[in-house]
Amino acid sequence: MKISLFSAGMLTASLLFSVPTPAHATPDYASLIEQAYQKFKLNHDGKVADYIPALATYSPDNFAITLATVDGKIYQVGDVKKAFPMESLSKVFTLALAMEQRGPQVVLDKLGANATGLPFNSGLAVVLTKGAPENPLVNAGAMSTVSLIEAENKTARWNKILDNLNAWADATLTVNKPVFQSEMATNQHNLALAMLMNSYNSFYGDPRETVEIYTRQCSVDITVEQLAKMGAVLANGGKSPFNGRQLLNESYVPQVLAEMAIAGLYNGSGKWLYRVGLPAKSGVGGGMVAVVPGRYAIAVYSPPLDDAGNSVRAQQTIEYVADATQANLFMAH
């Protein structure tokens, strides 16, 4: 185990952010994540995503946990050096960029905040609502988010998105070219979604350019430590505990967390919130992050997914740690 200390429908948003710190002593996070790692490392439930060929090459045995606190401490165990593509995890941070640029009311009006109850790549959800904004964490809404980013041109838009990811991760992130090429070769469905949204005037840029940027964004590699640091920004009121930068207006953080609670685990979001009571976001690359406002963020990497596209071991691990630290936001503390 490696531990490094002192590293540089709508759910009510206020509930998701304004949670008092429990009076009990600070948990032994190092021991807790070690227990979770040992408890779940031999669980082989789920299946590695293969609809994007490059994702099928990742080992189902990969498993890593990082917990990052709002005072800049890092606790981690497992395959923490192994990078993986962000995939849908990236949606949260581009949403935050759009929120910072445009404000929460524009985001609500143009991107929405309702669960679809359908898979993350559903075209039916678009048709049933006649293109009305649903939420920015399903594929159609996430591509609309990319198109909403203020920039002079395609290159400038991508640079703003990548610079934003770098700032949140406190690192220099790069695109995984084999994953990007694999996704570009198999992204006809996303292109169709973008065209469909555009036909309903719910798209705010060129569909083909936007899909390329979105695909590039999803192909950015990250480690579980970097992901936990990104989550810790949200736990710390939009300010990075690691580089000291205010990356998101503190008053906008509850809205980002609300979107995560509504649709962060796709059509598994409701059951997750019912069981665990935390805003979270997953990606089909096997990563997942959950946020405990005012306390910590926890990130897990494990490629095998359930039927909804969420990492099985990540859900188990985060639920275990959340229960042990009384992190459920719906509990009286």
Where does each model-flagged region fall?
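Bacterial N-terminal signal peptides
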Residues: 7-18
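Short glycine-rich loop/turn motifs
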Residues: 60-65, 192-194, 285-288
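Active-site SXXK
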Residues: 72, 84-108, 230, 298
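Positively charged n-region of N-terminal signal peptides that target proteins for export
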Residues: 1-5
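Beta-lactamase-like hydrolase cores
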Residues: 24-65
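Active-site-adjacent helix/loop patches that line small-molecule binding or acyl-intermediate pockets
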Residues: 28-35, 43-44, 98-217, 233
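Short, conserved catalytic-motif segment at the N-terminal edge
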Residues: 52-56, 68-82
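Structured C-terminal helix/loop/strand segments within mature extracytoplasmic catalytic/sensor domains
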Residues: 235-333
